[in-house]
Amino acid sequence: MSELFNVADIFGENVFDDATMQERLPKKVYKDLKKMIEEGKELDLATADVIAHEMKEWAIEKGATHYTHWFQPLTGVTAEKHDSFISAPMETGKVLMSFSGKELIKGEPDASSFPSGGLRATFEARGYTAWDCTSPAFVRKDAAGATLCIPTAFCSYTGEALDQKTPLLRSMEAINEQSLRLIRLFGNTRAKKVTPSVGPEQEYFLVDAKKFLERKDLIYTGRTLFGAMPPKGQELDDHYFGTIRQRIASFMKDVNEELWKMGVTSKTQHNEVAPAQHELAPIYAKANVAVDHNQLVMQTLKRIASEHGMKCLLHEKPFAGVNGSGKHNNWSLTTDEGKNLLDPGETPHENIQFLLVLTCILKAVDEHAALLRESAADPGNDHRLGANEAPPAIISVFLGEQLEDVLEQLVTTGEATHSLNTGKLETGVRTLPELAKDTSDRNRTSPFTFTGNKFEFRMVGSRDSVAGSNIVLNTIVADAFSQACDVLEKADDFEKAVHDLIKQYATEHYRIVFNGNGYSDEWVKEAERRGLPNIRSMVDAIPALVTEETISLFEKFHVFTRAELESRAEIKYENYAKAINIEARTMIDMASKQIIPAIIKYTRSLADTVNSVREAGVDPQVQADLLKEITVLLGQTKEALDVLKKVTEEAAAMEEGESQARYYHDSVFPAMEELRRPVDELEMIVDKEAWPMPSYGDLLFEV
């Protein structure tokens, strides 16, 4: 890659964006496409043919030889099938490059090989991908050459959603319709659309590729299943925001260049809290585009890391004892006029529309806390949530001092008469500039926090698509808006009705507001007293997806059908069971083939040393004590290994579903922890040269 470049010159150069379409498409075709994007109008095949031709010509100019419908099935990662632009050879033996409107609009991958949760039988293979024209096509360049990637939705032959994008787009329509209803009540007749804006911050680890390949657990599961803590971890806080090392800086430069060319607004990069941990954050985009971009970010991080002799770990908890990784899903609502509905203004107590929006969101989060928690449920996330490094598993809302004061006024007196003045920041140094204080501090222990003009949902796992959480957020807030509008549209005295409703929602849902330390034991007790759910694991979270309340909610806004929700719950149970099964089998393999043989070999050497020392006429007490300690731990390891084998076999023999997932959680996972304990103790006392894999110190500090 080039050493120096101008970001403005390269940004979006590989994106078939609005400017490119306006330049290349005939005026009428461009106008029809914009109408389809903005108003949801249908596109006729003749117009699609013109768009496809120009898209193909543009992509070929970029070096593309293939195109793919780029979609997001329920595997958690993107999927793609590549077709070249060549047509059947002519009589001369030459080929033409072609791409039709039909090929642009619709693809037909095999749906039977993707998770469907019973929606599709193995013999029912037909599935469709449909062009999402609101997310621009782009050319991706990698070792395979250049490929035209067309973002698409994925559905079954009978129309059920088999992906993340379809319900996300449905939820965006729901929040748009209900937001427009709400702002119309306040006299805004100009806005035609309200869009959820999303900015997902991405955390990740980087390790040396050679060391990665010496760890079966990292290869098969993405996290270390064994590993003792090194003498130093993250306790000095010296890695967070520290100077970025040259190898990492070179990697970040190449990541940024690739992302900028594909139109991803990579904005912020820094070292995170744990050693070898880093973060990348983009500028906000429309929810569906932001979801697509986050998938591109994860793919690009992994690809560029390999090119730099490293591996990017996106698992939520790749290393025990140091922080794991997540995504902060920043969410707001913006009109097509650029108005942010979550902007409180200078005097939020006077901003009635904002207060209604705010209290509706509190109502939504309080009433659907379990569903919001479920949207972040993942086997890896079970290691993070509630572990004093990430938000607790209890959903609460942090508002900050100013907004909490406004809410307290509403709850206690029935009206808000003032907003706290944030004032200036006093540094005590005359040469430093005077700084205005923000309206709220940051609370990193809160799962759902207001940060000035947006909410930040901090529970999402680092590997997960942010689609799931945004589907839930959009839908539950749309429902709260809908209920509020149902009341206010019938009111004879709108001003009184809206004030009464704001007070009602603030009072009824004030229990969800918590500005304190979410890591404390006191909060767990207080949350229980308030009646807030504390859902600690993925298997305990999944049932919220298929309650009658949830089904009614999603069916009301045509986001999910009952069958789609039931299928997703089934898939999640299966995914949990499969993930833990792979981890358990990997531990069994590593313990049986690497760790126990290495320890036996080492004890043999140690026993020889004991005998040699004794023969030399010296008391071998130290060596003998060490040999005894290792032998005891080796016995515990073998005993724990046998237990893990037994419960893993029992779990694998069970019928797939909730019962099997719970058995993996209740029996297999604890058995894995029991096997890890003696192995990690052994690593602390066995000669490093005898240990069969790189240590935490090697992985975290040698990259």
Give the ranges of each region predicted by the language model.
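Short, compositionally biased "basic patch" segments
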Residues: 1-8
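Active-site core of metal-dependent hydrolases
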Residues: 10-125
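Active-site proximal loops enriched in glycine and acidic residues that flank catalytic Cys/His/Asp
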Residues: 47, 71, 100, 282, ...
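Hydrophobic/aromatic-rich, well-ordered segments within soluble, folded domains that form packed cores
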Residues: 60, 64, 68-72, 293-307, ...
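Short linear, low-complexity motifs centered on an aromatic residue
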Residues: 76-92, 109-112, 117, 215, ...
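Glycine-rich, acidic/polar active-site loops that bind/position phosphate-bearing ligands
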Residues: 125-314, 323-326, 333-570
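Composition- and surface-driven signal marking solvent-exposed, interaction-prone regions
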Residues: 219, 294, 316-317, 343-347, ...
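C-terminal amphipathic alpha-helical interaction region
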Residues: 507-703
